[in-house]
Amino acid sequence: MPDSKRNSPAGIDAGLLAALMDKVSEFGSTGDGGLDRPALTDNHKAARDWFAAEMRGRGYTVLVDAIGNLFGRIDLAGPDAPVVMIGSHLDSQPLGGRFDGAYGVIAGLAAVETFRREAVEPRCN
């Protein structure tokens, strides 16, 4: 008999998604709903530092490579399971919108947190 928990759709926690987007949007906010967080600026670093701390607080292993790319890893399927990577960026175009890149980062975290909340046992990390 199939595991109904594994096969049933799980919804992303909209409250979590909104809260994380609100927080990351503080870094470089123009105050009028816009965002200015170009790469390698203090606002970009602050957003990266916040996101790294957010992942660590949720039990992820956080790595930063030689050029500053930020990686979060959590083992949900065992040490030998294949890995799925989700990527985006926390910097923005000058005067880009609040969803410029950051939404992909935040949505990836929220998706993985959905697996954890729903006790889904994925076949990959």
Regions found by a protein language model. Name each.
Residues 9, 39-40, 100:
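A generic structural signal for short
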Residues 29-75:
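A non-catalytic alpha/beta surface segment that caps or lines the substrate-entry region
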Residues 21, 25-28, 32, 58-59, ...:
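Structural signal for hydrophobic packing residues in well-ordered secondary-structure cores
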Residues 70-103:
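Catalytic-core environment of secreted peptidases
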Residues 86, 96-125:
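Alpha-helical metal-binding/catalytic segments enriched in His/Glu/Asp
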Residues 13-20, 43, 47-51, 82, ...:
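General structural feature for long, well-ordered alpha-helical segments within catalytic domains
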Residues 5, 32-36, 93-96:
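Short amphipathic alpha-helical segments at helix-loop
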Residues 1-31:
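N-terminal hydrophobic or amphipathic helices/low-complexity stretches enriched
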